[in-house]
């Protein structure tokens, strides 16, 4: 019964009724053959072959032959792997016109469907001769129809994307199998295949099938039409249509290619037969062509020309392409797709500006599909892309090789932003110009660019394309929305809510599942496959169980979860089938079988030791034996594709479940849960040569799922310096698929970096062989932990590490789950807090068992270990950990810094050794590649993970020393047995939340902290004295404590911190702590606690100085050197450690004034040395030696490594220098040499050798233009090839690498010391070796703040600013004023911002300085800012205006990119926070919930009004001014009571509102708003009433400012709605900065150019008509050349011309003879004209042939000169000339006739170079000639006789009387000018002259044969114009 086809059924034994039915079916479905079958009863079938009912369960019994049913129960396990696609669709039932939900399963060549997936019997449809097409014309219900010879089904999908996916799957199922290739080429198959794209449609006139040539059935000719070439077919004939759709590339042209002799290709015509439009006219014979009776005549798909069958041979072979020639990419120019996925293009000759079109098929009242089809018809189909299907990247990649092209985005503002973002990604700003066609709702950008508010009609698309071709270019500013999100407090909830705190959990599960799916498809490693399969099952089970638990009443969600389980089971079936036969007995099949056998998979959850609230552990992974087996699995192509389809199916099901779990907030998932649009998995291309020998214990390509993916958090509690994004190593084979999280030592203390993953590194050994090093970052910050929870040191692991003693199980990973939250902060608390809490609890139990002697012994052993640099076994119990250990570590005694094992080698690059050097130390004078990574953007992963740990002895030791080498982040308070633990986050957060980050930065950066230890020198000497040791004893001791303790000692140096001591060493936070402690007697008696601040360097987020590491003192006091030479002699012993922390020394130009503070302290005397640079000199003095002593201990970091006590120790305290500029702004100048000398001088004063040029070579990848020698560059490249410590960064994330909230604590290059005088040339050099910086040249607000908060500032009096010399207010420091002259933000030099390489803008030219603040902001009714109740706020209340209203920004706009922010999105139009964003967010949610209610632009406007009215009542954004802070260019703006803030880049907001208002007043202080001036407009929104009124009223009182950068601080713990270009989301608390990103070329409408082009084209058309011959109705007459013979009509005009010239010559001669006083030159001109006239008719006979036209040129020239001279003479002498009355009249008539005749003449230069004359057979032009602009000559004769003036009448030209005198020929000419030549014969037959023409009516025209309504209207209007003229 298989493969039944209807047209070969045996009907011999059928009844007559059955015979007729079967014969009708055969004729109708003539598409294939059927195997012979005996008597087959056939039910009734429609004529076009469609079934009257496709539901098999209700059809009559005989129809079963067409509905073959098969049982899939027995084949399920064997055949499911070959399923291409499956899912639910709505199926149309023909009987009752209903839709039923059915489950469809698509295999190759077959389609099955049943009621649900669990059915055992499916209906089978053979797809061998399939035709499928789209039924929905207007993209309404996403329906499509599939037709086979036996079946016809109409199916409906839920979305257009799903419908297109099904259509693509049907194409895959029916296409012949081909070898697996590149996914890009597979995606391009549609473009390059030339297949038709059918859709069902109806036609208003008879239409014929292009396949069978029969008429389409029905009154409306219902059938299928190709959306590209308009080929018409029956539904039954679609499968037989050949693939001859519109060409796309040269390969599709095929045999029609025409090559010229020179090798160039010609674009030929592409003809489509029949179905021509009504008004089609033959391009050859100009007669009507086409027919409604049959399929005849031809139409070109490119130039739109139509031609008769007989006339087609006479058509030119070259196709002109049509009216859009400038925009079309000819298929002959596109040769192929190159290796970089771009077209190999050969530009055609002539003008060429290709147009790339992106259409959003959902935009424009769902009319986007119509525009998509229309563009494909007008242009090359390969130029047009649907954004919904392919996105913008595909088109941009194809057009990459075009030097210049245009982009047309047909959509709303959101899609425009999408395309512009992709242009950013491809870096194609200079190649393309972007235009917008308004198809969206708001279309603000299109309004501003001049393209209107909407475009709904596609009929005038050719004319619209011409407008885009004549558009002009303007630059559009684009702004980066940089966000820094803080952790927020989530209120305790009784039950998990998916919409709030569990978003991180959902994201982690989805991400983990996606990773495992990718591993299953791509990996060839069996162990990886096993672990990924188990992890995937566990993750999916956990996800489904948790979602279903909290959505028990949602049946649809339960259905989606069931589908997910079923698809997961099918994936496992496919894996099992794949492994059967080849690996039937291995553990993979057993594992899969065990997973399938589980009926209700449940994951055992138990409390985690890290967080008792949320955690589970997957115990099933422990049961898998990780034995080695085959490294690659041989799969056939079809099996691999089936596995890929299964994985994609599971992936899509997971996305459906997650998206359905919160339907009201889909955007939030996309933006905050990082759920990107679905991307299908692709099968990787593998080569056989890439496989690894089975004997290798570690494969060459490391397994990519050794550890489960980390859980992503919904919002970053803090930006990590190395975010959890992919980092590529120098060797691309290693870190390409491994996510490297930030090491704990480099992460911020408030950051939860997630679960670290495996790190594998490669290093070349001495013998050249490759050694793999595998390291694992533990949750405890680098410590290795065993199963029992005991901590392993490297030495202990080395002793225990054998494969038999310990098995490495990489599969046990703690996974965050959602147990009921006990602590409301637990979901957002950093994981470090959980770690410390856990270790605290663990160690408190073990601490009781330790004895004091044991602790002392361990501490001594640790000191010995550090002194001898030898590994030693710790004598303590192991600490419990989370089973993330480093296997196979073997310590060799020969090298103290190398750990080796049989599998890998680990090199400790930071080990304290004098003998070992890195691999690059053989290069003299060059820093080690391994060690220089620390000062660059790289980190030594292995050294920071596997350095030797020590045995802790107390709870403080355990918490402080979680890592292996004392690298502890110092951004949080120290925790020891002397310090009480700080609850929550760092104190600096509390301070910065009150003061703001800018003030906090000032306080911190001007405070001397103990972090200076590593700032100035690597060897700081004693960082802190150990307990029970004095400072002096420590200085003389060579033994350095292993423990780092930043708290003050109890008995030495700094015994107590009070107002008399020196607490500044511990940072500003400790000042505040000390103040707080003095207020509490209890706290006074307790030892204070201190915290320190992280340091930051350019190009890195957190500097190496932030991690304190013990430095061995290799220099005793007796070998101390006083000069640079001795220092050089001492260098070899310290070369490697010295280069470890050396930073780059740079210079800046003289116009960048950047200084710092230098304090010099001499131990021998109280006088300090003096250092000068240029004109600045600073002398720092100290009063007593007692002050020096505390400073000496606190600022030991500035001591030179070779300078010790006893020789007049010189200390330089360096406040961090300005950050170097980035990019092109950093350029070597002539000042480099002087700066280098300055560096040498400063270094010699400090006793530090000068850095040579090779040591300056590495600093940051962001400053590529620094002066570095080529030799050093080569060394960089050479050594970076094998250095395992270099982790190169993704270029896309390089500029955001330095991301940390503490990064904002740096001193900016442009904020602390703003340049005021360019003559003040202060060089800057900075580094880690006490290079001197020079005193401030300009006062700073931070110094005043320091003086406010803490009077004990360790600054000399000379260093403080002189307040009386400031430019601003001279009032006291505590009085509100523009303190310190920060008026440069409103009246200063705009170009003072370093790093901004800007153009001159109108702002500078008009001397208006930004920011421009609205004066009403200063009014008293705008409330004060300081509302805080903290003690710092109280301290600053008196100075609130000074510190808040006019504060200098602490960070430059360019440098804020480095301050811990990440780019959320890019703004093109506007940014809104508050009520407007709330309305947009509500509208988006409404549209997602009910898309059918938001398909009309008018309805969308209505919804906006409804939601705005809702906000009028609810006021959800009330008191927004209390929740946000606004800064414009660094100036804090006081905010009134408002509900929103809008920042405008374009003068159009939310659908055309000019929210800024019109600036009509001349005295307006603001600049005219523009989108290309790099200026933003800031506006306040007081309510929805104001938003509505702004559409009607010009409001201006709500303006706030114009500026170039904006910062918005979101306070509190609640999310605030934010929108960018209409896309809204909820933004958590934090900071938002809007900075200029780049500029893009936009096409604006140029109406003046359009008018000019239209005028020119009209003149060209008239000119082309004037040179045509008189065309007759026959083709032979048209073949006669116009150059050879003067036509009859031209002869008639010529005779009139001769008569006019003769008459003028006659009367001019008579005038000269009658008035001898007139000049005689005019008489000579008249004689020459007469002679020329005689030459064309010698002896009374006109010349013939081409010579006549040549002779006429001379006649025309001489007669024109005669006419001009006569008019000039009469104008000049007319006032005194008295003419006879008859002479005046005759001369006037002669001149008037001559003027008319000259208008009909034209002279052209022909191809042969000769001039020929042509006569315009038309009536004279109605528009006056250019020479007629002056008054006519007869008016100039007003001084003549009165009688002549009274009797004068102007000649009749273009009046009703003139038209009344027309002959038939002139009427015919008039018709031809209106392009109505088809009625010429009718007018000639009826002898229609001018008199009859003026009286013609509508009925008369109908009698003359003018039946078209449009032609009738045109003729009647032209007659009316003649009558009026």
From Swiss-Prot:
Q: Which InterPro entries match?
A: ATP-NAD_kinase_N, C1-like_sf, DGK, DGKD_4H, Diacylglycerol_kin_accessory, Diacylglycerol_kinase_cat_dom, NAD/diacylglycerol_kinase_sf, PE/DAG-bd
Q: So what does this thing catalyse? A: a 1,2-diacyl-sn-glycerol + ATP = a 1,2-diacyl-sn-glycero-3-phosphate + ADP + H(+)
Which biological processes are named by the entry's GO terms? glycerolipid metabolic process; phospholipase C-activating G protein-coupled receptor signaling pathway
Establish whether keyword Cell membrane is in the entry.
Answer: no
Q: Where is the PH domain?
A: 82-175
Q: What is its EC number?
A: 2.7.1.107
Domain (SAM) ranges = 1862-1925
Instruction: Give me the stretches of Basic and acidic residues compositional bias.
Output: 863-872, 1115-1128, 1386-1405
Q: What is its main location?
A: cytoplasm
What are the protein's UniProt keywords? ATP-binding, Cytoplasm, Kinase, Metal-binding, Nucleotide-binding, Phosphoprotein, Repeat, Transferase, Zinc, Zinc-finger
- Primary enzyme class: transferase
What are the boundaries of the Phorbol-ester/DAG-type zinc fingers? 195-245, 268-319
State the protein's purpose: Phosphorylates diacylglycerol (DAG) to generate phosphatidic acid (PA).
User: By what name is this protein known?
Assistant: Diacylglycerol kinase eta
Q: Which organism is it from?
A: Drosophila mojavensis
């Amino acid at each position: 019964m298989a493969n039944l086809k209807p047209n070969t059924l045996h009907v011999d034994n059928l009844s007559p009724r059955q015979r007729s039915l079967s014969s009708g079916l055969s004729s109708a479905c003539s598409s294939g053959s059927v195997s012979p079958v005996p008597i087959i009863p056939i039910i009734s079938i429609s004529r076009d072959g469609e079934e009257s009912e496709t539901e098999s369960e209700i059809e009559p019994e005989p129809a079963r032959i067409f509905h073959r049913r098969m049982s899939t129960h027995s084949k399920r396990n064997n055949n499911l792997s070959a399923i291409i696609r499956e899912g639910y669709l709505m199926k149309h039932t023909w009987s009752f016109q209903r839709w039923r939900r059915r489950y469809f399963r698509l295999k190759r060549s077959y389609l099955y469907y049943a009621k649900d997936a669990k059915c055992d019997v499916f209906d089978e449809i053979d797809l061998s001769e399939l035709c499928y097409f789209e039924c929905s014309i207007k993209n309404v219900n996403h329906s499509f129809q599939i037709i086979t010879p036996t079946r016809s089904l109409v199916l409906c999908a839920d979305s257009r994307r799903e419908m297109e996916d099904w259509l693509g799957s049907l194409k895959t199922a029916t296409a012949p199998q081909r070898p697996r290739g590149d996914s890009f080429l597979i995606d391009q198959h549609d473009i390059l295949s030339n297949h038709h794209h059918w859709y069902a449609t109806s036609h208003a006139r008879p239409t014929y099938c292009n396949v069978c040539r029969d008429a389409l059935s029905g009154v409306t000719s219902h059938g299928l039409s190709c959306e590209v070439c308009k080929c018409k077919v029956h539904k039954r004939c679609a499968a037989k249509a050949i693939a001859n759709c519109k060409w796309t590339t040269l390969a599709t042209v095929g045999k029609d290619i025409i090559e010229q002799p020179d090798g160039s290709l010609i674009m030929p015509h592409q003809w489509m037969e029949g179905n021509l439009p009504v008004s089609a006219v033959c391009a050859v014979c100009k007669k009507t062509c086409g027919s409604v009776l049959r399929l005849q005549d031809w139409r070109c798909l490119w130039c739109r020309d139509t031609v008769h069958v007989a006339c087609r041979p006479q058509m030119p072979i070259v196709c002109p392409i049509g009216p859009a020639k400038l925009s079309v990419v000819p298929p002959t120019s596109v040769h192929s797709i190159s290796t970089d996925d771009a077209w190999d293009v050969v530009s055609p000759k002539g003008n060429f500006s290709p147009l790339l079109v992106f259409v959003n098929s959902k935009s424009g009242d769902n009319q986007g599909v119509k525009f998509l089809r229309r563009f494909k018809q007008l242009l090359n189909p390969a130029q047009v892309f649907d954004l919904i299907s392919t996105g913008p990247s595909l088109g941009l990649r194809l057009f990459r090789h075009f030097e210049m092209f245009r982009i047309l985005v047909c959509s709303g503002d959101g899609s425009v932003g999408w395309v512009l973002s992709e242009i950013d990604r491809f870096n194609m700003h200079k190649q393309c110009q972007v235009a917008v066609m308004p198809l969206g709702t708001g279309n603000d950008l299109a309004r501003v660019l001049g393209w209107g508010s909407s475009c709904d009609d596609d009929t005038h698309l050719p004319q619209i394309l011409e407008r885009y071709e004549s558009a002009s270019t303007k630059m559009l500013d684009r702004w980066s929305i940089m966000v820094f999100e803080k952790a927020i407090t989530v209120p305790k909830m009784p039950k998990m809510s998916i919409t709030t705190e569990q978003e991180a959990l959902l994201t982690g599960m989805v991400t983990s599942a996606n990773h495992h799916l990718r591993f299953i498809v791509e990996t060839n490693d069996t162990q990886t496959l096993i672990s990924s399969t188990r992890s995937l099952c566990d993750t999916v089970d956990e996800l489904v169980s948790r979602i279903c638990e909290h959505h028990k009443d949602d049946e649809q969600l339960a259905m989606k979860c069931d589908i997910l389980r079923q698809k997961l089971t099918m994936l496992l079936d496919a894996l099992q089938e794949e492994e059967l036969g080849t690996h039937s007995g291995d553990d993979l099949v057993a594992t899969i079988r065990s997973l399938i056998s589980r009926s209700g998979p449940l994951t055992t959850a138990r409390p985690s030791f890290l967080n008792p609230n949320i955690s589970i552990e997957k115990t099933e992974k422990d049961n898998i034996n990780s034995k080695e087996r085959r490294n690659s699995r041989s799969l056939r192509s079809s099996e691999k594709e089936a596995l890929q389809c299964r994985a994609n199916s599971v992936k899509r099901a997971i996305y459906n479940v997650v998206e359905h779990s919160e339907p009201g907030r889909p955007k939030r998932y996309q933006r905050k849960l990082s759920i990107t649009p679905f991307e299908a998995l692709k099968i990787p291309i593998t080569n056989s040569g890439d496989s690894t020998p089975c004997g290798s214990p570690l494969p060459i390509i490391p397994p990519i799922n050794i550890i489960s993916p980390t859980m992503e958090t919904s919002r970053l509690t803090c930006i990590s310096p190395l975010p959890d994004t992919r980092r590529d190593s120098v060797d691309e084979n290693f870190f390409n698929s491994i996510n490297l999280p930030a090491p704990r030592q480099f992460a911020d203390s408030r950051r939860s970096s997630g679960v670290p993953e495996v790190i594998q590194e490669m290093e070349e050994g001495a013998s050249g062989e490759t050694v793999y090093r595998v390291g694992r970052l533990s949750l405890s910050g680098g410590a290795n932990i065993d199963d029992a929870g005991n901590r392993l040191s490297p030495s202990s692991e080395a002793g225990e590490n054998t494969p038999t003693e310990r098995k490495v199980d990489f599969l046990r990973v703690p996974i965050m789950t959602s147990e009921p939250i006990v602590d409301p902060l637990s979901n957002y608390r950093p994981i470090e807090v959980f770690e410390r809490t856990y270790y605290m609890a663990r160690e408190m139990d073990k601490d009781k068992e330790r004895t004091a002697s044991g602790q002392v012994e361990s501490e001594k052993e640790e000191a010995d270990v550090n002194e001898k640099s030898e590994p030693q076994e710790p004598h303590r119990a192991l600490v419990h950990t989370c089973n993330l250990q480093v296997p196979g570590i073997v310590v060799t005694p020969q090298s103290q810094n190398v750990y080796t094992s049989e599998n890998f080698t680990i090199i400790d690059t930071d080990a304290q050794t004098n003998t070992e050097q890195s691999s690059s130390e053989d290069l003299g004078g060059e820093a080690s590649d391994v060690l220089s990574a620390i000062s660059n953007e790289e980190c030594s992963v292995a050294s920071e993970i596997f350095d030797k740990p020590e045995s802790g002895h107390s709870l403080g030791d355990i918490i402080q020393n979680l890592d292996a080498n004392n690298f502890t982040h110092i951004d949080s308070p120290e925790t020891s047995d002397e310090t009480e633990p700080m609850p929550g986050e760092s104190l600096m957060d509390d301070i910065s939340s009150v003061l703001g980050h800018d003030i906090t930065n000032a306080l911190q950066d001007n405070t001397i902290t103990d972090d200076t230890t590593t700032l100035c020198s690597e060897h700081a000497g004693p960082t802190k004295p150990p307990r029970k040791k004095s400072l002096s004893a420590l200085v003389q001791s060579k033994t350095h404590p292993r423990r780092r303790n930043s708290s003050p000692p109890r008995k030495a140096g700094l015994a107590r911190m009070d107002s008399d001591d020196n607490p500044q060493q511990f940072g500003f936070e400790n000042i505040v702590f000390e103040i707080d402690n003095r207020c509490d007697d209890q706290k006074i008696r307790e030892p204070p606690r201190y915290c320190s601040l992280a340091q930051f360097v350019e190009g890195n987020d957190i500097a190496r100085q932030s991690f304190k590491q013990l430095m061995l003192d290799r220099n005793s006091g007796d070998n101390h050197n006083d000069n640079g030479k001795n220092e050089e002699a001492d260098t070899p012993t310290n070369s490697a450690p010295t280069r470890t922390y050396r930073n780059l020394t740079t210079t800046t130009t003289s116009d960048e004034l950047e200084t710092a503070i230098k304090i010099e302290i001499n131990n021998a005397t109280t006088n300090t040395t003096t250092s000068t640079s240029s004109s600045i000199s600073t002398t720092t003095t100290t009063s007593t030696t007692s002050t020096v002593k505390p400073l000496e201990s606190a600022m030991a970091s500035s001591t030179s490594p070779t300078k010790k006590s006893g020789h007049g120790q010189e200390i330089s305290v360096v406040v961090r220098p300005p950050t170097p500029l980035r990019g092109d702004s950093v350029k070597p100048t002539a000042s480099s040499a002087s700066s280098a000398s300055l560096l040498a001088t400063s270094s010699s004063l400090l006793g530090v050798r000068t850095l040579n040029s090779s040591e300056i070579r590495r600093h940051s990848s962001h400053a590529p233009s620094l002066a570095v020698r080529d030799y050093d560059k080569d060394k960089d490249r050479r050594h970076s090839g094998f250095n395992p410590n270099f982790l190169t960064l993704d270029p896309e994330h390089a500029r955001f690498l330095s991301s940390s909230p503490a990064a904002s604590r740096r001193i900016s290059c442009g904020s602390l010391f703003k340049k005021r005088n360019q003559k003040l040339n202060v060089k800057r050099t900075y580094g880690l070796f006490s290079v001197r910086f020079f005193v401030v040249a300009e006062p700073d607000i931070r110094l005043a703040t320091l003086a406010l908060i803490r009077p004990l500032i360790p600054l000399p009096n000379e260093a403080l600013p002189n307040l009386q010399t400031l430019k601003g207010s001279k009032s006291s420091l505590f009085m509100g004023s523009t303190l310190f002259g920060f008026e440069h933000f409103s009246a200063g030099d705009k170009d003072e911002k370093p790093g901004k390489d800007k153009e001159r803008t109108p702002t500078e030219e008009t001397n208006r300085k930004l920011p421009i603040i609205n004066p009403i902001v200063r009014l008293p009714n705008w409330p004060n800012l300081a509302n805080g109740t903290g003690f710092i706020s109280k301290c600053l209340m008196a100075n609130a205006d000074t510190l808040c209203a006019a504060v200098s920004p602490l960070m430059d706009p360019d440098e804020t990119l480095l301050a811990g922010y990440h780019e959320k999105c890019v703004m093109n139009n506007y940014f809104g926070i508050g009520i407007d964003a709330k309305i947009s967010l509500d509208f988006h949610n409404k549209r997602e919930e009910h898309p059918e209610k938001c398909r009309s632009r008018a309805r969308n406007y209505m919804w906006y009004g409804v939601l705005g009215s809702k906000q009028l009542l609810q006021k959800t954004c009330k008191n927004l001014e209390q929740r946000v802070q606004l800064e414009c260019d660094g100036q804090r703006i006081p905010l009134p009571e408002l509900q929103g803030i809008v920042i405008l880049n374009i003068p159009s907001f939310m659908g055309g509102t000019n929210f800024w208002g019109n600036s009509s007043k001349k005295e307006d202080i603001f600049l005219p708003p523009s989108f290309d001036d790099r200026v933003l407009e800031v506006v306040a929104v007081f309510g929805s009433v104001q938003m509505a009124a702004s559409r009607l009223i010009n409001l201006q009182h709500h303006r706030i400012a114009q500026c170039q950068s904006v910062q918005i601080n979101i306070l509190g713990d609640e999310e605030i709605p934010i929108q960018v270009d209409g896309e809204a989301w909820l933004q958590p608390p934090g900071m938002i900065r809007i900075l200029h990103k780049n500029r893009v070329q936009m096409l604006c409408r140029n109406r003046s150019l359009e008018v000019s082009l239209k005028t020119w084209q009209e003149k060209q058309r008239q000119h082309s008509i004037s040179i045509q011959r008189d065309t007759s109705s026959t083709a032979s007459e048209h073949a006669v050349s116009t150059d050879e013979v003067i036509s009859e009509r031209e002869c008639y005009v010529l005779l009139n011309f001769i008569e006019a010239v003769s008459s003028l010559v006659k009367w001019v001669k008579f005038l000269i003879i009658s008035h001898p006083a007139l000049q005689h030159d005019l008489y000579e001109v008249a004689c020459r004209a007469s002679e020329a006239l005689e030459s064309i008719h010698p002896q009374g006979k006109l010349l013939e042939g081409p010579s006549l036209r040549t002779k006429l040129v001379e006649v025309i020239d001489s007669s024109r000169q005669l006419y001009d001279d006569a008019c000039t003479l009469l104008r000049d002498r007319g006032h005194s000339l008295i003419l006879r009355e008859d002479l005046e009249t005759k001369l006037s008539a002669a001149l008037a006739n001559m003027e008319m005749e000259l208008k009909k003449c034209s002279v052209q230069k022909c191809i042969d170079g000769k001039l020929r004359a042509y006569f315009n057979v038309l009536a004279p032009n109605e528009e006056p000639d250019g020479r007629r602009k002056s008054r006519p000559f007869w008016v100039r004769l007003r001084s003549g006789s009165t009688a002549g003036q009274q009797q004068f009448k102007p000649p009749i030209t273009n009046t009703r009387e003139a038209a009344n005198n027309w002959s038939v020929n002139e009427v015919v000419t008039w018709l031809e000018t209106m392009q109505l030549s088809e009625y010429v014969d009718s007018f000639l037959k009826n002898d229609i002259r001018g008199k009859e023409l003026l009286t013609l009516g509508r009925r008369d025209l109908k009698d003359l044969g003018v039946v078209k309504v449009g032609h009738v209207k045109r003729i009647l209007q032209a007659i009316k114009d003649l009558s009026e003229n």
